[in-house]
């Protein structure tokens, strides 16, 4: 019997790791990856950090350059897909080529959620999703330039830190009443706000841009009535899933390709993962996790499901953020207001714990990354703690 052909669409973390997972889990059939980017699949997290700060930054490839040929994976870079035929199981490129598949993994990622008021500035306005975006930003983030960043989420704050370290004068505008309100607990939000303010970043909360005038400098009028002058304007206010191909193929979408917990779409031969995917949970709610680890996890899950193998157990959600000299790692559930702190954030060394009826369900480490491994195990096992002991620095965590 002829072995099946699997096609992967996308050029990021989830796409590359799907290829790796399929080979690791024993798939020996024909495997193709189609990407509209000219680069080999590369790591996205460094784009807002080392790619802007290092003297001679290099893209960090997800897999070594020789891996693709050694593992007989056919790479098609810099190509654009015109359509997906679900009935014919055919992928058609804009250059007229067509390719047959038995199973398909879609990891087309996401674009920056548009902000038309700023998009009208054209090349004077920046977002950050790809390596070419980082290269453009690196050119304009020069010392003493005034930089306005719209959005105080993870990307916005990482960009604020990098721009400040490059000598720019940075102002961040945020519609909400706090920074990183979507994915950090209140005590970490307060720490980050103070950290950026101490570094010289001006953060304007509960505010938004109402009017823009493009001139020698960009003039931004805010809801508060204040007017800012900017040499560089950047925004990061969320994502818009690259799900057009899926929509045109009549797959179930909702600002993303809807998948089940096996990463399967409404078509049993089509799977999806990474930022483009949104999971329908058992209770019917839709949930998206935008992180490096989630892309890896979903790639492994989809590969197992495609091959009819047992699905790997999901670890607690985890992501990290590097801002200035700080490394913050977030694991587990970030919801809730009853957080306790071990250590002193003012010394830039602390761990915040999220206990629910004594059970550890989440944590954030500040420059304490070595503690993530035991914390992950505790969250997975549902370990209970005495809050007093957990915050006592005289007691080693590993002894608890």
Curated annotation (Swiss-Prot):
Catalytic activity, reaction form: 2 reduced [2Fe-2S]-[ferredoxin] + NAD(+) + H(+) = 2 oxidized [2Fe-2S]-[ferredoxin] + NADH
Task of the protein: Part of the multicomponent 3-phenylpropionate dioxygenase, that converts 3-phenylpropionic acid (PP) and cinnamic acid (CI) into 3-phenylpropionate-dihydrodiol (PP-dihydrodiol) and cinnamic acid-dihydrodiol (CI-dihydrodiol), respectively.
GO molecular function: 3-phenylpropionate dioxygenase activity; ferredoxin-NAD+ reductase activity; oxidoreductase activity, acting on NAD(P)H
Name of the protein this chain belongs to: 3-phenylpropionate/cinnamic acid dioxygenase ferredoxin--NAD(+) reductase component
Keyword Flavoprotein: yes
InterPro entries with a match to the protein in the record: FAD-oxidoreductase/Apoptosis (IPR050446), FAD/NAD-bd_sf (IPR036188), FAD/NAD-binding_dom (IPR023753), FAD/NAD-linked_Rdtase_dimer_sf (IPR016156), HcaD (IPR023744), Reductase_C (IPR028202), Ring-hydroxylating_dioxygenase (IPR053382)
Subunit structure: This dioxygenase system consists of four proteins: the two subunits of the hydroxylase component (HcaE and HcaF), a ferredoxin (HcaC) and a ferredoxin reductase (HcaD).
Amino acids binding NAD(+): 146-174
Homology family: Belongs to the bacterial ring-hydroxylating dioxygenase ferredoxin reductase family.
Pathway the protein contributes to: Aromatic compound metabolism; 3-phenylpropanoate degradation
GO cellular component: cytoplasm
Keyword rRNA-binding set for record: no
Assigned keywords, A-Z: Aromatic hydrocarbons catabolism, FAD, Flavoprotein, NAD, Oxidoreductase
EC number: 1.18.1.3
Secretion signal span: none
Biological process per Gene Ontology, one example term: 3-phenylpropionate catabolic process
Binding site for FAD: 5-36
């Amino acid at each position: 019997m002829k072995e099946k052909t699997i096609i992967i669409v996308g050029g990021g973390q989830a796409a590359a790791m799907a290829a790796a997972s399929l080979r690791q889990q024993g798939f020996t059939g024909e495997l193709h990856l189609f990407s509209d980017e000219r680069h080999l699949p590369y790591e996205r997290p460094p784009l807002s950090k080392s790619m802007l700060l290092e003297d001679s930054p290099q893209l960090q490839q997800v897999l070594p350059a020789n891996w693709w040929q050694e593992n007989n994976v056919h790479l098609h870079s810099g190509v654009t897909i015109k359509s997906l035929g679900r009935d014919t199981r055919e992928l058609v490129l804009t250059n007229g080529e067509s390719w047959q598949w038995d199973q398909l993994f879609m990891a087309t990622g996401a674009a920056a959620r548009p902000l038309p008021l700023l998009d009208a500035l054209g090349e004077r306005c920046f977002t950050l999703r790809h390596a070419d975006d980082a290269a453009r930003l690196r050119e304009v983030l020069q010392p003493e330039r005034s930089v306005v960043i719209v959005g105080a989420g993870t990307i916005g704050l990482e960009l604020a830190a990098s721009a400040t370290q490059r000598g720019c004068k940075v102002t961040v505008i945020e519609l909400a009443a706090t920074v990183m309100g979507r994915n950090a607990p209140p005590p970490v939000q307060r720490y980050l706000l103070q950290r950026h303010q101490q570094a010289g970043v001006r953060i304007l909360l509960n505010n938004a841009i109402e009017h823009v005038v493009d001139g020698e400098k960009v003039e931004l009028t805010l809801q508060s009535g204040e007017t800012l002058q900017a040499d560089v304007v950047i925004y990061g206010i969320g994502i818009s899933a690259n799900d057009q191909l899926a929509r045109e193929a009549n797959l179930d979408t909702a600002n993303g390709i809807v998948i089940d917990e096996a990463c399967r779409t409404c078509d049993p031969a089509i799977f999806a993962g990474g930022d483009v995917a949104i999971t329908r949970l058992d209770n019917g709610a839709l949930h998206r996790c935008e992180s490096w680890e989630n892309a890896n996890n979903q790639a492994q899950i989809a590969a197992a499901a495609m091959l009819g193998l047992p699905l790997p157990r999901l670890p607690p959600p985890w992501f990290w953020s590097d801002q200035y000299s700080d490394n913050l790692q977030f694991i587990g559930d970030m919801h809730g207001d009853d957080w306790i702190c071990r250590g002193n954030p003012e010394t830039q060394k602390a761990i915040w714990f999220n206990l629910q009826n004594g059970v550890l369900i989440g944590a954030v480490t500040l420059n304490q990354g070595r503690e993530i491994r035991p914390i992950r195990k505790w969250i997975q096992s549902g370990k209970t703690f005495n809050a007093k002991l957990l915050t006592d620095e005289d007691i080693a965590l590993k002894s608890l």
